[in-house]
Amino acid sequence: MAYPFQLGLQDATSPIMEELMNFHDHTLMIVFLISSLVLYIISLMLTTKLTHTSTMDAQEVETIWTILPAAILILIALPSLRILYMMDEINNPALTVKTMGHQWYWSYEYTDYEDLCFDSYMIPTNDLKPGELRLLEVDNRVVLPMELPIRMLISSEDVLHSWAVPSLGLKTDAIPGRLNQATVSSNRPGLFYGQCSEICGSNHSFMPIVLEMVPLKYFENWSASMI
């Protein structure tokens, strides 16, 4: 999860988030190299008193700086498209959970089970126990099995919302009348926090998301106790 004065991304917990972090580093390296080269050329031209006759009109140079940026953009676009297809692909999900956004809480329905559904509200600050996180704790966590592909069906009952869990690389819009889907998969157990990422009204900041990723056996015991 995030911590105060954090400069980097949250620790990756899913394969998608690992790919996104690698792509971020890949793109940042390209941007750094281009920026360094441009700044070096600008400083060189500003500090030297010599002027090359072909600096202002050189067909070869213009050809190079047309082809080179195109090649760089392709190097950025190809891994980006690959990740987009990975995020959209859902093959044989082990579990399907329907998520509905409301003003200002989330409701969840485990479609593979009968009568396994609940609402998830933020716990007010005055009701927090020692060690719990302000504005992030909920009364009902979403318990899911780890190391399995899980399909989330996301929509909204009223206005636009966005279901986002940064450490899992998830951010999917909840749109009234439309059903979006996302894949959830965690490499390790733990609690993973998120929030609504679309301004949805006065209490937009008060609809957190808490995923509890657990081993399959623990999930089976939990689901049996909830039915």
Curated annotation (Swiss-Prot):
For the ligand (Cu cation A1), the binding residues are 161, 196, 200, 207
- Locate the residues binding Cu cation A2: 196, 198, 200, 204
* Entry keyword tRNA-binding: no
Which EC number(s) does UniProt give?
7.1.1.9
The protein's job, in short, is: Component of the cytochrome c oxidase, the last enzyme in the mitochondrial electron transport chain which drives oxidative phosphorylation. The respiratory chain contains 3 multisubunit complexes succinate dehydrogenase (complex II, CII), ubiquinol-cytochrome c oxidoreductase (cytochrome b-c1 complex, complex III, CIII) and cytochrome c oxidase (complex IV, CIV), that cooperate to transfer electrons derived from NADH and succinate to molecular oxygen, creating an electrochemical gradient over the inner membrane that drives transmembrane transport and the ATP synthase.
Give the quaternary structure.
Component of the cytochrome c oxidase (complex IV, CIV), a multisubunit enzyme composed of 14 subunits. The complex is composed of a catalytic core of 3 subunits MT-CO1, MT-CO2 and MT-CO3, encoded in the mitochondrial DNA, and 11 supernumerary subunits COX4I, COX5A, COX5B, COX6A, COX6B, COX6C, COX7A, COX7B, COX7C, COX8 and NDUFA4, which are encoded in the nuclear genome.
Q: Which GO terms describe its cellular component?
A: mitochondrial inner membrane; respiratory chain complex IV
Instruction: Indicate where the modification Phosphotyrosine is found in the sequence.
Output: 218
Tell me, what is an example of a GO biological process annotation in this record?
A: ATP synthesis coupled electron transport
Q: Spell out the family assignment given in the record's similarity comment.
A: Belongs to the cytochrome c oxidase subunit 2 family.
- Provide the transmembrane region boundaries: 15-45, 60-87
Q: Keywords of this protein's UniProt record, alphabetized?
A: Copper, Electron transport, Magnesium, Membrane, Metal-binding, Mitochondrion, Mitochondrion inner membrane, Phosphoprotein, Respiratory chain, Translocase, Transmembrane, Transmembrane helix, Transport
Q: Which residues lie on this side of the membrane: Mitochondrial intermembrane?
A: 1-14, 88-227
Q: Where located?
A: Mitochondrion inner membrane
Q: Which molecular function GO terms apply here?
A: copper ion binding; cytochrome-c oxidase activity
Q: Which domain of life is it from?
A: Eukaryota
Is this entry keyworded Phosphoprotein?
yes
Q: How does it sit in the membrane?
A: Multi-pass membrane protein
Write down what this protein is called.
Cytochrome c oxidase subunit 2
- Tell me the InterPro entries matching this sequence: CcO_II (IPR045187), CcO_II-like_C (IPR002429), CcO_II_C (IPR034210), Copper_CuA (IPR001505), Cupredoxin (IPR008972), Cyt_c_oxidase_su2 (IPR014222), Cyt_c_oxidase_su2_TM_dom (IPR011759), Cyt_c_oxidase_su2_TM_sf (IPR036257)
Cofactor binding note: Binds a dinuclear copper A center per subunit.
Give binding positions for Mg(2+): 198
